[in-house]
Structure formats: structure tokens, C-alpha cells
Amino acid sequence: MTTIEIPAYAKINLYLAVTDKLPNGYHTVETVMQAISLHDTVTVEIPQNAVEPITLTCSAPYVPCDETNLVWRAAERFFEAAEAQNTDFRRFPVRMHIEKNIPVAGGLAGGSTDAAAALIALNRLAHDILDTDALLAIAAKLGADVPFCVLANLGHPTALGLHWGEQMTVLPSLPALHVVVAASGEGCPTPWAYGRIDALPHDPENGYIPMVDALTIGDPDAVFSRMYNIFEAAIFPERPLAKQCHDILSRHADRALLSGSGSAVIGLFTDPTRAEIACAALRAEGAAAHLCRTL
């Protein structure tokens, strides 16, 4: 096998609290993450007569295709880990392509899930030289969302993330729901978003435990009532289009919530017709709306 194509699933946050700011400036979090069917596609192949060891292309012209891209960095870290694991391992040239569908800078882990898919594809091309724990260790060095995306792209769509979000515990899957993702296009750079919440109270009463309990019993209504995102209080006053998307979704969805640090907003629905109506309402206001489902 010389070519592998992997779906790279988007991430939403069912629960997201910031618990502390460390002396080094990083924040610790408690978050429950869920994969949805909206996805990019990452293709990795071993080309014949390759000139460069790594080549990266992307369908979106605004995505850099060099060493700054997380997919490129994932490939470099994978080869380093494979060589450390087995001294007989020899690097092979790779050509990688990202077909983008996930809105960028929306709190949906688009770059992280592409990197996770690349790690999985490279490992399969290398005959599974690394186990899942080794892949997760690489992922944790690439970014806080990458370990969850590895788990999700391997078939574990719901997980609890602690510390910086990289300490993962697989949770019972969310009951099947319809999802509308609304992208206002305003963008929320992560450092800016975290700077906005430093003055806010960081930990809601009881923390993430009620959400884990709701998932364990498999009750959608209990999940809806326990959804929380600290960033809403900080982001919506600064991103009016995201707030407008939230207002529209709230009129139709069982629950609407900001995803990650924004600016994408998601709505969860038990009724597919209501999800379609919400999509149409968002598009009528000029927002990009994606109809998908939980995994």
C-alpha cells in the first residue's frame, strides 16, 4: 500500500472550563470533546522518484504548505519517533494533501485533526511501527487538541481532556445527534481569546463531572443542560456575528454553544427538520452553515 486517505474529523466542545493560569502563561483546562462528521480529508502517499522528502499541498490557498503547517511538523515528529523506536527503520519520502472543509480559526481543531490524520496515515504506511500511546505522545507535543483528534480519527469520538487538554480519557459516546456548525468568519486567535478570559471566574460549580455523568447514562437532555463554554462571556461581546449565529441557533436547536475559543458556534438537534431550518436561517443571514452529525 503506497497511498492512504484518512478523514480528519472536526471537534466540538460540549464542556470547556479554564481552571488556572500557570506561571509560564499557559492555561489549564477541563473539557469534554466530541467528534462530528464534518471533516477534511488527508491523503498521504509514497511517491516514485521523489525529489523532496516531504511535499505538502492543500485545496485552500490560505493554508501554508511548508514547515509551519502542523501536518508537516507531524510528519517530521513521526519519522523521529519511528527511528527512535526501531533502529532499522528508514524514512521514506511522502507527498501529503489536505482537502479542506472545516472552517479555519473557528475552534473546530481543523489544523489539529489534519495533523492527527497524517500521523495515522504515516503509521499505516510504516506497517504500524508505533502503537497508539506513541502516537498520542507525538500528538501531545504538536498541540493540545491533537491527542483527542488522534483518538477520534481512530474511532473514539468522545473524550475528557485535562491539564492543557492533552491528558485524555475516553468517554461513552454522545447519543446520535444532528449538528449545525455556523462559521461567522470573524476568527478568534487563541492567545487573544485566552487573554480575554483571565478576568473571568474559571470553574463552574461541580466542574465537568455532571457532563461525564450525563454521557454515561446516555441522556441527551442531561447533556444539553450541562453544556458550558467559558469563552462565550468573553467572545460574544467582541464578535457580533458569532453572537448573531448563536441567537439564530438558540431559536431552533436543543442547545447552542460556542465551540472551543471560537468563533464557530454549534447547535445540537434531536430533530433533523429543525436542523435543516436552522441551516437555512443562518444562510439567509450570510453565515456559512454546515449540517452534520455526531460520531
Q: In which residue ranges do the predicted regions lie?
A:
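Short beta-strand scaffold segments in enzyme catalytic cores
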Residues: L16, D40-V44, D145-V150, A159, ...
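Conserved, helical-rich catalytic subdomain that frames metal- and/or nucleotide-binding sites
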Residues: L151-R255, T270-T273, C279-A280, E285-L295
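ATP-binding N-lobe of GHMP and related small-molecule kinases
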Residues: M1-G106, R124-D133, L154, L174, ...
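Generic non-transmembrane alpha-helical segments
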Residues: A74-Q85, A134, I138-K141, Q244-H252, ...
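Short, basic/glycine-rich phosphate-binding loops at helix/coil junctions
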Residues: A50-P64, A118, A140, D219-Y228
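Glycine/serine-rich anion-binding loops at beta->alpha junctions
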Residues: H97-A126, A144, R255-F269
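Contiguous, small/hydrophobic- and glycine-enriched helical/loop subdomains that border
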Residues: A115, L119-H163
